[in-house]
Amino acid sequence: MRTIRHKAYKSLGQNFILDPSMAEKIVSYAGSIEGYNIIEVGPGFGTMTEIILRSKVASLLAIEKDRRLSPMHKGLMQKYPNYRYIEHDVLEINLETMISAPSKMIANLPYNISVILLLRMLKYIHNFEKLTLMFQKEVAERLVAKPGTKSYSILSVLVQLLCDVEKVKDLQPGAFSPPPKVCSSVVNITPLGNLRFPVDYSYMLKMLKKAFGCKRKTVRNALGLPHQEFDALLAECRIPPSVRAENLSVEQLCAVSNFLQSRQYQFSTG
């Protein structure tokens, strides 16, 4: 196990994986990576990084904001010519341009940026064959949540519209250094290539923000639909009149979005 020489920064959402056997297990969830171009966000002390590099990958690009870790990774670059290390905030770079097929992402994501990074990547997530990512368990449960459950949210809908999602492993806080206050989960995200159901993604995103904006409101009240419009929606989409957005499946929400767009319904910004 590596020796910690630097204190983890809470502001960077750092919780390091230092046990090589644990890191190897996480990498294994990505399946075969030989010949792949891998992206790792938040490599930390490089425990998982070196395991990836020993797996005969075509290339590995690691992006790390903490400049204190650069010397360690520069040493790895000298050892592995197919390794590229960027010292930068991943939220401030154009990650899409750095993806080379065939590509997978394997990462113990900094918890403070995991959701916003994933939401941004949804625009080009089809460029990855697979993503094996570490999240806080609460976030992982949102990714795989079913309609009518407490964890079901906009994030659930968007990710499941674009990908197959599987929570493959829960990890206790003791697997990390320093131990986080919550449990963590490894999630496999496999992009579909196309939307699971036909829908205008940009329009649906606007609709979801309104529909999920007030969880206690029915779809009609959340969207501010006139009676006549709502009655037509009920007939077309076959949903109960008192239904809330969090009780509708991804397919049903797509149907609602398509119906409203066909009626050229515009959502108020208030």
From Swiss-Prot:
Binding of S-adenosyl-L-methionine, residues: N15, I17, G42, E64, D89, N108
Sorted UniProt keywords: Cytoplasm, Methyltransferase, RNA-binding, rRNA processing, S-adenosyl-L-methionine, Transferase
UniProt KW Methyltransferase keyword: yes
Gene Ontology CC terms, in alphabetical order: cytosol
Paired cysteines (S-S): none
EC number of this enzyme: 2.1.1.182
InterPro entries xrefs: KsgA/Erm, rRNA_Ade_diMease-like_C, rRNA_Ade_Mease_Trfase_CS, rRNA_Ade_methylase_Trfase_N, rRNA_adenine_dimethylase, SAM-dependent_MTases_sf
MF terms (GO), sorted A to Z: 16S rRNA (adenine(1518)-N(6)/adenine(1519)-N(6))-dimethyltransferase activity; RNA binding
Keyword Iron-sulfur: no
Enzyme's top EC category: transferase
Catalytic activity: adenosine(1518)/adenosine(1519) in 16S rRNA + 4 S-adenosyl-L-methionine = N(6)-dimethyladenosine(1518)/N(6)-dimethyladenosine(1519) in 16S rRNA + 4 S-adenosyl-L-homocysteine + 4 H(+)
UniProt-listed Gene3D superfamilies: Ribosomal RNA adenine dimethylase-like, domain 2, Vaccinia Virus protein VP39
Subcellular location, record wording: Cytoplasm
SUPFAM superfamilies referenced in this protein's UniProt entry, alphabetically: S-adenosyl-L-methionine-dependent methyltransferases (SSF53335)
Protein family membership: Belongs to the class I-like SAM-binding methyltransferase superfamily. rRNA adenine N(6)-methyltransferase family. RsmA subfamily.
Role: Specifically dimethylates two adjacent adenosines (A1518 and A1519) in the loop of a conserved hairpin near the 3'-end of 16S rRNA in the 30S particle. May play a critical role in biogenesis of 30S subunits.
Protein name: Ribosomal RNA small subunit methyltransferase A
Source organism (scientific name): Anaplasma marginale (strain Florida)
